[in-house]
Amino acid sequence: MPLLTTPYAELDLIRQPEQANDPLQAFDAADEYLLAQLHDQAPDANCRVLVLNDSFGALAASLAGQLQVVSSGDSHLGHLALEKNLARNGLPFDSVPFVPASEHWQGPFDRVLVRVPKTLALLEEQLIRLQGQLAPGAQVIAGAMIKHLPRAAGDLMEKYIGPVQASLALKKARLLTATVAERPLAKSPYPSCYRLDAPALDLVNHANVFCREGLDIGTRAFLPHLPRNLGRARVADLGCGNGVLAIASALANPEAEYTLVDESYMAVQSAQENWLAALGERPATFLAADGLAGLEKQSLDVVLCNPPFHQQQVVGDFLAWRMFQQAREALVVGGALYIVGNRHLGYHSKLARLFRGVEQVAATPKFVILKARK
């Protein structure tokens, strides 16, 4: 893989999760453009820089030890990538503090480097949080590949920060620079909430939660077919989102024990709040994690999963395949993985390569619900 070479550093970077022979690199031209732009401004060593949504640590690791850097984002895998890439390049583990998106950072900051996220609600929430956290004369510089840069990103920066200047395109990347100006303090519209009829739940969704404004159709197809009569089973909701699968299952299985896992900090925050609202003080475990990688082998009886088919803007089934592998490792012999998936993704054949028995529980014109037994 090529090295990231910028005015600040030459770094050997890897993506997360790691894949053998991964053809994708851990940085792009937007990262290079952001770092070059910052360097051209010649900030001194005391400059406080906040890095937002740094996919695999390219920005923060480049600035580590040179400026006063704080990184924040909603991806646990992004956090893990930053830690691994710091170590991989001989940089101190604690040279870049990381603040999960479920928590608030402490300014003032002189510069903010932003990778424009896929979910504009997350960008809006972050820009609102920046109000009152920026030093006089501060700039917010957002970068993206042009094909992933919506016009609305600049509109949001103008609304919450100040006047925006768009750069020329460079290697198919573009920057938007907002200079701090007087703006009325905004009240965040997040989290949002929607009502589910069966089971009757009011579900809280923080800004970066998948299908924040309503139940996704895959989960809607899955809910009527969740397993019952689980007794004291140990159940994991893998990729839990707002926690609706685990909560619905827990309501039908009062003795079962639940672990809710997602790589999004805001998803886990939403799941925890929704569990508390629906089930009170009933114990459960909530993890922002790399799937089930940290769980002991053969520690679960049931895994529920509505697997994603994209990581940021990259589409594919590699995350789902990895989740299936993790579920197999974590399940006891005889344990079962229940999933929902689009028919065209062919999950049945993939599961058959890992599990001794795969059966179709139900189907709609678009989705299948499958049970795979170890």
Swiss-Prot record:
Signal peptide residue numbers: none
Q: Which SUPFAM superfamilies match?
A: S-adenosyl-L-methionine-dependent methyltransferases
EC assignment: the record states 2.1.1.174
Q: Which reaction does it catalyse?
A: guanosine(1835) in 23S rRNA + S-adenosyl-L-methionine = N(2)-methylguanosine(1835) in 23S rRNA + S-adenosyl-L-homocysteine + H(+)
Arranged from A to Z, the UniProt key words for this protein are: Cytoplasm, Methyltransferase, rRNA processing, S-adenosyl-L-methionine, Transferase
Pfam families under this entry? MTS
Report the Gene3D superfamilies cross-referenced here: Vaccinia Virus protein VP39
Question: What is the top EC class of this enzyme, as a single word?
Answer: transferase
Molecular function terms, GO-annotated: 23S rRNA (guanine(1835)-N(2))-methyltransferase activity; nucleic acid binding
Say yes or no: keyword S-adenosyl-L-methionine present: yes
Localization per Swiss-Prot or TrEMBL: Cytoplasm
Task: Name a GO CC annotation attached to this entry.
Answer: cytoplasm
Q: Which InterPro entries match?
A: DNA_methylase_N6_adenine_CS (IPR002052), rRNA_m2G-MeTrfase_RlmG (IPR017237), RsmC/RlmG (IPR046977), SAM-dependent_MTases_sf (IPR029063), Small_mtfrase_dom (IPR007848)
What is the documented function of this protein?
Specifically methylates the guanine in position 1835 (m2G1835) of 23S rRNA.
HAMAP family annotated for this entry?
23SrRNA_methyltr_G
The similarity annotation says:
Belongs to the methyltransferase superfamily. RlmG family.
Output the PANTHER family linked to this UniProt entry: RIBOSOMAL RNA LARGE SUBUNIT METHYLTRANSFERASE G (PTHR47816:SF5), RIBOSOMAL RNA SMALL SUBUNIT METHYLTRANSFERASE C (PTHR47816)
Protein name per the record = Ribosomal RNA large subunit methyltransferase G
**Which gene is the coding source of this polypeptide chain?**
rlmG
